[in-house]
């Protein structure tokens, strides 16, 4: 049996770049492996956006500067969306991403410290449930590793 470096699952690298719009299905282990990268990219985008938001608030009456800052804001957010999509995660809102498990989503919103929630495909953020509860009750196939506490 070939050795593995822990970064591969289902025959593909966990960090494989996806084509825009390409949906990827994650196991819990795979999602947890890529989660630190998702969290770091998101934190960087949030940090990059902070001074832009401050400038927008300070220049509410100055239309040309405000318009320029709005464009910069949109560029930062779009770069973040593109990076998330290339990682195979679903962007559900600003700083809100879902990892598709095939029967639902592992759900995370910045600045939560862990990937700790789940909701079904037909549900949204408001119906998300603690991940440990879902694993305990449903024992889903995608939960192929010991839950983190």
Segments (PLM) and residue ranges:
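Long, non-globular targeting/processing and low-complexity regions
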Residues: 2-16, 75, 88, 108-111, ...
């Amino acid at each position: 049996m070939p050795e593995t470096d822990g970064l591969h699952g289902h025959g593909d690298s966990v960090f494989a770049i996806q084509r825009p719009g390409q949906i990827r299905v994650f196991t819990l282990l795979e999602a947890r492996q890529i989660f630190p990268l998702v969290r770091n990219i998101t934190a960087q985008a949030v940090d990059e956006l902070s001074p832009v938001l401050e400038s927008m608030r300070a220049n509410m009456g100055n239309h040309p500067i405000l318009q320029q800052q709005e464009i910069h804001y949109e560029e930062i957010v779009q770069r973040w969306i593109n990076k998330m999509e290339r990682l195979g995660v679903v962007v559900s809102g600003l700083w809100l991403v879902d990892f598709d498990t095939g029967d639902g989503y592992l759900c995370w919103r910045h600045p939560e410290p862990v990937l700790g929630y789940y909701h079904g495909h037909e549900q949204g953020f408001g119906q998300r449930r603690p991940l440990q509860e879902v694993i305990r009750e449903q024992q889903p196939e995608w939960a192929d590793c010991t839950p983190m506490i």
